[in-house]
Structure formats: C-alpha cells, structure tokens
Swiss-Prot record:
Pore-forming subunit of the rod cyclic nucleotide-gated channel. Mediates rod photoresponses at dim light converting transient changes in intracellular cGMP levels into electrical signals. In the dark, cGMP levels are high and keep the channel open enabling a steady inward current carried by Na(+) and Ca(2+) ions that leads to membrane depolarization and neurotransmitter release from synaptic terminals. Residues 743-751, 809-824, 873-895 are extracellular. GO terms for biological process: calcium ion transport; detection of chemical stimulus involved in sensory perception of smell; detection of light stimulus involved in visual perception; membrane depolarization; monoatomic cation transmembrane transport; monoatomic cation transport; olfactory nerve maturation; photoreceptor cell maintenance. Residues 165-174, 387-406 have a biased composition (Basic and acidic residues). This is Cyclic nucleotide-gated channel beta-1. The gene is Cngb1. InterPro entries: CNG_cation_channel, cNMP-bd_CS, cNMP-bd_dom, cNMP-bd_dom_sf, RmlC-like_jellyroll. Pfam families: cNMP_binding. SUPFAM superfamilies: cAMP-binding domain-like (SSF51206), Voltage-gated potassium channels (SSF81324).
Length: 1307
C-alpha cells in the first residue's frame, strides 16, 4: 500500500504529519473513551472548512488508508489512562508511540473501535493547536481530569510520533502485531519518509500537521517567540519523537513498550532523523525567558542553509481541517520554529543537515510579513484615533458627571451602602455563575469533540496531552497570529513608548487601563483575521491570567455580564511571562464599579464599542471613588457646622435670629463680582506671557510696551509736568539769550553754528509740544472729562494758546538769507509764555512747600528785569559810542558784568552814578528809574505775600492762643489750668498742624470726608474686636462720626460713676485704668488700638455708669464715638446691631463672673472642729454645769453653733445679692449695676468697687479687708466687721456688729 502511494504521489516532505494525525486521535480516545466523543465529531465537520490544497490532499490520503485508522483509534483508546501519570513522570520515552501502537494491535477487540474512529476522522477535520496549550497550560492543569480526554484529540496532529514513527505505527497497525511487521516497516519506512523541505516542519509537533511545503520555507531564518515547556527530552530520546516528547512528556511515559521492542529499529530511526532533520541554531534570546516557567520554552533562531534540495511543487500531508484554516490565516512561517527549542537539548548529539529551501516560499513569506506589518501600522493608527476619541468622550463624561455630582449631595452615602451591598451580592452571584459555568463547560466539553476556532499562540506546551487538555477545557478559542521575535520586540518597544506618553497625558483613572494594556505587549495585536478576546479566569485565586486573543463563539453565552467577549479559563495557572501582579489585579478589581464583574482582561480594543466599555469601567470606578470621598468630607464639614450652630443657638437665642433672618449684606457683596471680572481679563492677558519649554510651562515677564498715551490728564500726569519743564527751559533760553545776542557782541561768525543749533533745538521742542502733547490734553466739557482724540484736537485748535503757539513759531528765520543772522528775528519765540504759567501752576499743585518755589520765581523776575536793563544800557552805550561820554560804558572789563552792575544801581536808585549829559541819556535814565521803582515795589510786595502765605497757619495758631490766654486772664483762671491749655495748643498744633480737623471736614463733601476718614482711621477701627464681623459699610458710616480729641497727661478721660455716653478708641498714646480702695491703683494700661467704654455705649436697659477711672498716661489722641451717633447708624444695620448686642451680653456675663469672689466675709471661715474636741464637748454637756470647769466647754460649744448659724445666714444673703445684681446689671458696662450703693440693708456685705469695662480685672480689695481682719479679728471673735460704700462715690462706711445682736436677728 505504501509503495503504491509512493508511486502515485510525489515524495511528501510532511508525511510525518500524517503520523501526527494518527497519533493525535490516539490521546483523544485514550483519555476520553467513556465520553463517547466519536459521534459528536461527525456532527461538527461543517464549521471547519479546508481551504488549503495541501490539507485537502492529506485528507484523501487518509481515506486511502482505512486499515491504519482503526489501529490508531485503538492506540488512542488505551493511551488515555496514562496521560495524567505521564504529566508527572519523566518526559522522555523514545519508543513510546511505536510501542503503544504495537500493544494496541495485540488487542483485536479494539480493532473495530479504532477503525470506526479513523473513519470518523475522515469526516471530521482534526484541528491542530500550535501553542495555545502552552499559554493556557496553567489553566489546563487545573482540571486535567475533566477535560483531558477532549483535549487529546487536537493534539493528535502534534503527537511525538508525528514525524517518522507515526507513519510506521500507522502502517503496522494495518496488520497483526508481530515481528515481521517491524521488519517490513524497517524496509519500507525509508520509502515513505521523504526528506522534509523545511526543518521546522519536521521538528514541530503540532504545526507540522498544518504546515505545508509552499509556506514553511519562508520562515526558517526568522525568529519566533516560544516558551520553554520545561525542556523535558533528554539525549537518548529518538529524534523522530524528540520534538513531540518535549511538549508532552507525559504521553510518552504513559505508552507501554511493546513486548518485541526492536533495538535496531530505534537506532536506525535515530540515524535517519539525524541525517534528515536540520540542527537548530540557538540564540541568547532564549535565556531571557523565565526559567521557572515550565509551560513555556525560550525563543530560538533556526538557521537553515539551502543545499541540494529541489523545490517541491506538491506535498502530500495528512492535515486536519482546522490546520487548513490556520495555514490560510497565519502561514506556516510563524509555526515552524515552535519545536526548535525542544530540539535544542538534543542538538549536541545530532548533526546539522543543511537543507535547500525554495526561494519562492521565502518571497511569499516576506510579502506576508510586509502585509502584516502594514496591517499592524494601520491598526496602531486606528487605535490612536480611538484613544483620542476615548479621551474626548471621557472629558464629556466627566463634565456630565460633575454636573450630576452637584445635584447629588446627601444621596451619596446611601448609594455607597447600596453599592457595597450590590458588590457583595454580585460576588455571591459571580461565585454561583462560576460554578454553573464550570458545570456547563463540562457538559459542553462532552458534547463538543472538535474546537470551534483555532487558537495559536507564542507558547509551546510541555506535551501534546497537556495541550489537548487545555484546548478542550477552553470552550472558546481563537487563532492568534505568531510573529517573529524581532517583530515582537519592536512592538513591545512601540507599545511601551505609547504607554509612557499616555501615562503623562492621562489621569490616574486611566492608569488602570494602561496596566492592562501593558499585559498585551507580548501578544499579537488584534487584526481583522484575528480579533481579540478577553480572558476571564474563573479560578482567580490560582494565579494571573494569560492575555489571549480569540474569537468568541456565537453559541457560547458570555461569562461576564459586562463583557460579551470574555473567555472563562478554569484551572490553576502556572508561571508564565511577566504579567501584572496579583496585588495590581486586586487594586484594579477594587477600583471597578459595582456594575462590572471582577474580570481581569488584557486587550487592545478593536472597536469603539469595546473602547467605550473599558473606558467606562475605569473612569466610573475611579471617579466614583473620588466623588464618594469628596462627598463624605463635605458631609463631615456640614455636620460639624450644624453642630456648632446648634450649640450657639442653645447658648444664645439671638444667634438664630442673626443667621435665619434675611441679610442685606450679600447685596453689598454683589459689587465684588464686577471687579472679579477684571482679574479674569487680567489673567487672560497674563496667559499670553507664559512660555512653553520642553516639559514645563513658566511665566515670563512681559515686554513693557511703552506706548504714548492716547490722552493726557494735565492736572495729575507727572510726565506732562516734566515735559512742561523742558518747554520752559526752551522758552527761558530764548527770553534770556536773545537780548544778550542782540546787544552784546557775543554772536560771531566762528560760533554762529552753535547758536543756531540751540535755537533750532528749542524750535523742535516747541513743535513737539504743539503737535504731540497739546492735542492730547483732556478737558472738561459739561461736567465730563473728554478723552476723544478728535475733540481734544479741536479744543486745542480753537483755544487762544494755539494761536500764541503759532505766532511763536513764525518762520522769520528765512529772513536770515536776506538780512543776515539777526537775533531779533527770533523774538516771537518769547510768546510761549502761557506754557511758563501753566508749569508754575502744575508745579505748585504737587509741591508740599509751594511758597519756596514762589519765592524763587519772584526773585527770578527781579533778576530778569535787571538783565534786560543791562542789555539796554550796553546797547545805548554802543549807540552813542563806547567811551564817548562819561555816562556810557567805557569798554573796560567784562561788558556784561559792568553793565549789570550799573543796572542794579540804577533800578534800586542807590545813586552815585554819573549824570546823563545828552538828551538821549537823560530820557533813558528816567525810564530806568520809573521801571526800577515799579519793578522793585512789585517784587517786594510779592515777596511779602509769599512769606505771609507760608506762615499763615502759624499766624492763625498764635491768634487763637492769644485769644484763649486773654479769655483765661479775664476770668482769672488758675495758672495751672492756663498752663495746661497752652500745652494743649502747642501739642495739637505740632502733632496735627491744625487745631480743629472738623473745620476742614465741614468744607468737604461726604464722599471726600469718607475717603479721608478711611485712610486715617480705618486701620485702627478695623482691628477693634468689638466691630469685627459687622457690616463694612456700617464701619464706614461710623468713621465719619468719630471725633479726634487730644488728652494731656493725667487728664481724666472718664470717672467712676459717670453716665457713659461715649466710646473711646485710642489712636495714639496710652491710658491707665485706676481702681482699688483709694481709686489710685493702676489696674490696666491700654495702648493704641484698644477700646474702652463700649459696654456703656451698648447697654440696653440702663445701668451704663462708669465703673472705673481712666486717666491719660501721656499725650493721648482718642477717637470718640457718641452713643447717639451709634444708635443712628445701627438703625440701618439690624444684623450688626444684633451682633453687637450679643457681644455686649457676653462681656456682661464675663464681668459678672468674678462677683462670687468679691462678696466674701472679712473674717475667713474657721477650720472644722476636731472630732476629739467635739467628743469632749459632748461629754462636758452631759456632765452639766459642774463638770468641765464650771461649764466652759458647754458655753464654747454653744458659741460655735451660733457662729455656724451666722455663716449660713451670710451665705444665703450673698446668693440673694448675686441674683439681684445679675438681673439689674443686664446692660450695664462692666457690671455697673453692682456698683450702685445699697444702704437699705446695712447688714449685708457690700462688694468693693469693681474694675472698669472690658479689659480691667476686678480691683484687689483684699488688702484693706485683710488689714481690718488682722486688727479686729483676733481680739474679739464675736464681732463682725463690714465695709460698705457711703453716699459719696469716694467714701466708705465701716460697720461693726455684735454677735448678740446678730443672734437676735437670726432668731
């Protein structure tokens, strides 16, 4: 039969795959004989198409060999019981498959079952799993007993005997088991086993059944990621079975050796495999895998050198239908190197045989790789777009949630409780669901014989049995495209960079999803052919999950209610690639919202719907937790505030009316909203000055844009005054030097250019003043300040000043060309005198001592007149001739100085000058005399006015002082009082610069007075504790009512017993509060900013007498507020009125507390009588008057009883007095009611005088009382001494009471 196949068909390089197919069903039926899986595969042949031509050829080949199938079925039927044992046993058993085949042939009873199974295998395509079992190895180990029988079937294609031994066993199974079968196999096996085109096909356990010749040659030089499944196969393992024994050592251990084990056949097989299979080239990348991962193998690189191997057009392979789909989707290039690490252990004993690979297949593989890379890039771009859409959606969701959070306040606590309850319920429900799912999975595993979707992965399992168990245990599987190691590393680097960027941009709520995304770095990104699948670990405690990407079957209901594409993986998980730790998973599960089930999923969402689902999962979780925490903190604060409010209400009922009553104060806070908009605009402007650098954003100082103002305020703008100064300098240049240049010969041809330069510089200043400044000056029209450019320009053009400015700039200099440079042509420049006068006014307005400038200006007028006269004198002398007469200038010395001296003597009329001789000289001299008299008289008068204005205040002070002294002398006031008055005048004048501020305030409007009062007094009044919390406008109104008064040292500000109608605020200086028995003891010293007398001012029910004397310690300036003015203000501010009354009541209560210590008996209470003494008294009383020395002890005992009764009565009287005083002193300052004398009851003890109002402690009256106690107490214990105030405030009455009289009163 085999010879016929060899003659008809070309030599198939993958014939060992046929044996793999035969070996695959063996473990299937072997582990699951009782589950009756055979009828089920016949029902499910349709969902798995067979698109590839090579697998189609493999299927008919299986049909042509019916006798092999039953034998293989038998082998599989008996291989099952040893699967679990082999998982724990040593992996290597070289002749396991062949031996198992022989043993099963010895059983004719199983021939029918095996033949039926092989026939069923024709109909049902057998899927081959490359490495899905390796990925889910841990999950599969959790329940090998449950699902091992089902998972054995797909592993048949990757069985250890798939390469060479499988064909041998399949052919030996056609006949009875005997030695001749082995001999015949030995002779014909060489014909059946052709040289494989690619070493990866011969090495692979599972993929060889699916790998065809046109696909594999492209990938032998590429690196594929695989994981070491514990490196099971040792050296003695057969080369044929070696790659398969590595993934599933348990299967080999379970197979029993046949009774006739031919050693020759094993040696021959080893020799042939060494020649046929190429040796893999190992790389260091494999060592980077975790050594502790038994279910995975390291990545290996296989180098295959093309040698005399011809390209094969057709390859006959026995391949399952599932593998046909896998070849179409994944390609053989990604599956060839899975078994390379397995062969790594045996590479030392094997010879590397280079094989020739077809170039066409390599090109096809490269094209596929390029396509895959393009698809991956497209997928990444789509993912980035999706992430951007996610972020936008998240921001929108956040905004919506923030709005909802404002509406939800107190409901959060209830929701939190409900969420906890729901979580507990969901946990219970999930546990129940997991149990049900496990049961359903077991049932479905029994019903389903073949997997629905191929599951490929980068992992290689230890044995085909484990792989099959895992594949059967998973009800949902999908094919994952395997990539070479280099491509995988690039993907990992790219994804890591993306994750780093996302971590910087996204918030904490997105970090959970980033950790999930990191887990998918080792997997292949989802594509159209390979959509992603999220894996849900039903045994979450066993270990972390492996990220897998599979296609969820439509008939499988979703495990998790939140995710429809979740794959439940029962069983314990072994060590795998580094994934998020269990602690991280626990944190992620805690962060999930109660609506989501605790499913840990790793995936890159391929659709916007999946992306939305994951975003909601993380965003709602983190946001809910943050919202709940914030809400709880707010609730705690609210509860604290409510408790404080309730306490205040219970303590003082006025608080309720203060807070519950509608307040107009918020209406006054409304204007603050308008200025709030200005900072927003300012911030908007400031944002422009932020500079973004590499990773930070900092604020830089904006460039100062010096722009000329659009309008100028001539009254307050200092820059305009400075400009006027330069204009005045130019004007003075012309006024002073034009006459000099005209009269004196100082302008010559050698320096004419300097004079002209200065002239035209002054002209330029004039021109700027006209064109730039004067046209921008603001002016008042109809009460409004006009700042419009056009109106300001028109106003200047229509003014008289513009006309004078035009005249002063007449271009008479053009006449220089005809008349020469004559300085007189520049006389119009002196017409800009209006700028000079304006400058004087503006400068005097800003100077603190304007009279100084006035004096200087008047002196300048005098000097200028002398300057002009000297120029005229030199001109007259030159007109008549220098030195022609005795009166003219003789030309000796400095001409200007000598002429100036002559002008001074002439104008001041000092005399001593030569007499004029000619008519011209006489007329000129007369004009000089008249001018001098007029000029000097004006100058002297102006000087007097200037000096008088400078001393006007001092003059007023002297006049007031003189009037007051005259008044005091007229009424013969004592000299001491007169001195105090004079001192007051001097101090007030020197400290304030005026005698009465009110005189100035009366002249100003209310707004001006308020502004001045705020600047002067607000800082002091705002620090007063009494007015803190009051309406700010009320304080402003109060400032206008304050009066400033100066007190001299030792002046009484207020005296004890006076009716308090004023409150005092210390502005400067100190005052002392006096008290004590003599009223001279200093109780307290109050400094600037302190307040006293406020209780009398706020007293409601009278009793507002002063309780102490207050004396100025030095010169003290006090602000006084009358009670009448305060009441008028408080009428408009009811809330502030209630607040002030509340504070006044508290002060009264605080001042009433010390009364308990004041009403104390002068004689201190006696110590308790000793018990022994009482016993002696009792005995003496029994003995009668005779005992105890004539009854002295009995008499003493009676006395003690009387004293005790008197003390009790005194205490009752004190309590009554305290009750009365507390009622009467409701509104009195500093418990003023208690200070009123009560002579009606001379027997009750009277308190000593109390201290003044707020800050003064009670006067220490213990010293005088102690002195009386020392004087009167010891000599006469039966006498009671009391001190009570007399009719006058400064008098006290001392009363002495005998005990006998007191006794009668008590009786």
């Amino acid at each position: 039969m085999l010879g016929w196949v060899q003659r008809v068909l070309p030599q198939p390089p993958g014939t060992p795959q046929k044996t793999e197919e035969g070996a695959g069903p063996q473990p299937e039926t072997e582990s699951k004989p009782e589950a009756n899986p055979q009828p089920e595969p016949e029902v499910q042949p349709e969902p798995e198409p067979e698109p590839e031509p090579a697998p189609e050829e493999a299927a008919p080949e299986v049909q042509t060999l019916p006798p092999e199938e039953p034998v293989e079925g038998e082998d599989v039927a008996e291989a099952g019981p040893s699967l679990q044992e082999t998982q724990e046993a040593d992996p290597p058993q070289p002749t396991s498959q062949a031996q198992v085949a022989v043993v099963k042939v010895n059983r004719p009873s199983s021939w029918m079952l095996s033949w039926f199974w092989k026939g069923m295998e024709k109909v049902v395509p057998q899927p081959v799993y490359s490495s899905s079992g390796g990925q889910n190895l841990a999950a599969g180990e959790g329940g090998p007993d449950q699902d091992g029988a089902q998972t054995l079937e797909p592993c048949g294609t990757g069985d250890p005997g798939s390469e060479d031994g499988s064909d041998k066993t399949s052919k030996t199974q056609d006949t009875e088991p005997s030695l001749w079968l082995l001999r015949w196999l030995e002779l014909n096996l060489e014909k059946v086993l052709p040289q494989p085109p690619t070493p990866s096909q011969a090495w692979k356990v599972e993929p060889e059944g699916a790998v065809l010749e046109p696909d594999p040659p492209g990938t032998p030089m590429e690196v594929e990621p695989t994981e070491n499944p514990s490196q099971p196969n040792p050296g003695p393992v057969e080369p044929e079975e070696e790659p398969a024994a590595e993934p599933q050592p348990g299967f080999q251990a379970s197979s029993l050796p046949p009774p006739g084990d031919p050693v020759r056949l094993i040696e021959w097989l080893l020799h042939r495999l060494e020649m046929a299979l190429p040796q893999p080239v190992l790389h260091g990348k494999a060592a980077e895998q975790e050594p502790s991962c038994p279910g995975t193998c390291d990545v290996q690189t296989i180098s295959i050198l093309p040698v005399e191997q011809a390209e094969h057009d057709l390859v006959l392979e026995d391949v399952d239908s599932c593998w046909e789909d896998t070849q179409q989707e994944d390609g053989a290039s990604l599956q060839e190197t899975e078994l390379a690490p397995i062969y790594e252990d045996e590479s030392e004993a094997m010879v590397e045989m280079p094989r020739e690979l077809p170039q066409i297949q390599e090109e096809e593989e490269e094209e596929k790789e390029e396509k895959e890379e393009k698809e991956e890039e497209e997928e990444k771009e789509e993912e980035e777009k999706r992430e951007e859409e996610k972020k936008k959606e998240k921001e929108e969701e956040k905004k919506e949630k923030e709005k909802e959070e404002k509406e939800e306040k107190e409901e959060k606590e209830e929701e939190e409780k409900e969420e906890k309850e729901e979580e507990e319920k969901e946990e219970k429900e999930e546990e129940e669901k997991e149990e049900k799912e496990e049961e359903e999975e077991e049932e479905e595993e029994e019903e389903e014989e073949e997997p629905i979707v191929l599951l490929d992965s980068c992992l290689v399992v230890q044995a085909d049995v484990d792989q099959c168990q895992l594949e059967r245990a998973q009800p949902e599987t999908a094919s994952i495209q395997e990539l070479p190691e280099e491509e995988e590393e690039k993907e990992e680097e790219k994804k890591e960079e993306e994750e780093e960027k996302e971590e910087e941009e996204e918030k904490e709520e997105e970090e959970e999803k980033e950790e999930e995304g990191e887990a998918t770095n080792s997997t292949v990104p989802a594509t159209k052919e390979h959509p992603e699948l999220q894996v849900e670990d039903t045994d979450a405690e066993a270990g972390p999950l492996i990220p897998e990407e599979t296609i969820p079957p439509p008939e499988r209901p979703p495990v998790s209610p939140a995710k429809s594409d979740t794959l439940a993986v029962p069983g314990a998980a072994t060590h795998r690639k580094k994934l998020p730790s269990q602690d991280d998973e626990a944190e992620e599960l805690k962060a999930l919202s109660p609506a989501e089930s605790p499913v840990v999923a790793w995936s890159d969402p391929t659709t916007p719907q999946e992306a939305d689902g994951e975003d909601r999962a993380a965003s709602t979780a983190s946001q809910n937790s943050a919202i709940i925490n914030d809400r709880l903190q707010e609730l705690v604060k609210m509860f604290k505030e409510r408790t404080e409010k309730v306490k205040e209400k219970l303590i003082d009922p006025d608080v309720t009316s203060d807070e519950e009553s509608p307040k107009p104060s918020p209406a006054k806070k409304a204007p603050d909203s308008a200025p709030a908009q200005k900072p927003a605009e300012a911030e908007a402007a400031e944002e422009e000055h932020y500079c973004d650098m590499l990773c930070c954003k900092f604020k830089r100082r904006p460039w100062k844009m010096y722009q000329f103002p659009q309008s100028i305020d001539p009254l307050t703008n200092l820059m305009y005054i400075l400009w006027l100064f330069f204009v005045v300098l130019a004007w003075n240049w012309n006024c002073w030097l034009i006459p000099v240049r005209w009269a004196f010969p100082y302008q010559r041809a050698d320096n004419i250019h300097l004079w002209l330069l200065m002239d035209y510089l002054c002209d330029f200043i004039y021109l700027l003043d006209i064109t730039v400044f004067q046209m921008r000056l603001q002016f008042v029209k109809g009460g409004d300040i006009i700042t419009d450019k056009k109106e300001m320009r028109n106003n200047y053009l229509k003014s008289q000043r513009f006309k004078m400015d035009l005249l002063c700039l007449l271009p008479l200099d053009f006449l220089y060309l005809k008349l020469g440079v004559n300085p007189l042509l520049r006389l119009p420049r002196c017409l800009k005198y209006m700028a000079f006068f304006e400058f004087n006014n503006r400068l005097e307005a800003i100077l603190s001592k304007a009279y100084v400038y006035r004096v200087i200006r008047t002196t300048a007028y005098l000097l200028y007149s002398l300057h002009l006269n000297s120029c005229l004198y030199y001109w007259a002398s030159a007109f008549q001739g220098i030195g022609s007469t005795h009166w003219v200038y003789d030309g000796v010395g400095n001409s200007y100085i000598r002429c100036y001296y002559w002008a001074v003597k002439t104008l001041i009329t000092i005399g001593g000058l030569p007499d004029p001789q000619t008519l011209f000289e006489i007329v000129f001299q007369l004009l000089n005399y008249f001018t001098g008299v007029f000029a000097f008289s004006v100058m002297i008068g102006q000087m007097r006015d200037v000096v008088g204005a400078a001393t006007a205040g001092q003059t007023y002070y002297r006049s007031c002082m003189d009037s007051t002294v005259k008044y005091m002398n007229f009424y013969k006031i004592p000299r001491s009082v007169q001195n105090r008055v004079k001192t007051w005048y001097e101090y007030t004048w020197h400290s304030q610069g005026m005698l009465d501020e009110s005189e100035l305030m009366v002249q100003l409007p209310d707004k001006m007075r308020l502004d001045l009062a705020i600047d002067v007094n607000y800082n002091i009044v705002s620090k007063v504790a009494l007015f803190q919390g009051c309406d700010r406008q009320m304080i402003f109104d109060m400032l206008k009512r304050l009066r400033s008064v100066v007190y001299l040292p030792n002046d009484y500000v207020c005296k004890k017993g006076e009716i308090g109608r004023e409150m005092y605020i210390i502005q400067a200086g100190q005052v002392q509060v006096l008290g004590g028995p003599d009223g001279k003891a200093v109780l307290v010293t109050l400094k600037a900013g302190s307040v006293f007398g406020e209780i009398s001012l706020l007293a409601v029910g009278g009793g507002n007498r002063r309780t102490a004397n207050v004396v100025a310690h030095g010169f003290t300036n006090l602000f006084i507020l009358d009670k009448k003015d305060l009441n008028e203000i408080l009428v408009h501010y009811p809330e502030s009125q209630k607040l002030l009354r509340k504070k006044a009541r508290r002060m009264l209560r605080n001042n009433n507390k010390p009364k308990e210590e004041k009403s104390v008996l002068i004689l201190p209470p006696r110590a308790g009588t000793p018990k022994l003494f009482n016993a002696a008294l009792a005995a003496a009383g029994k003995m009668g008057p005779r005992g105890a020395k004539g009854g002295k002890l009995a008499h003493l005992r009676a006395r003690l009883k009387e004293l005790a009764a008197l003390e009790a009565a005194a205490r009752q009287q004190q309590l009554l007095e305290q009750a009365k005083s507390s009622q009467e002193a409701g509104g009195e300052e500093g418990s003023g009611a208690t200070d009123q004398p009560a002579p009606q009851e001379p027997s009750e003890p009277k308190e000593p005088p109390e201290p003044p109002a707020p800050s003064s402690p009670p006067p220490a009256s213990a010293k005088p009382e102690g002195s009386t106690e020392e004087a009167a107490g010891p000599p006469e214990p039966s006498v009671r001494i009391r001190v009570s105030p007399g009719p006058d405030p400064g008098e006290q009455t001392l009363s002495v009471e005998m005990l006998e009289e007191k006794k009668e009163e008590v009786e």
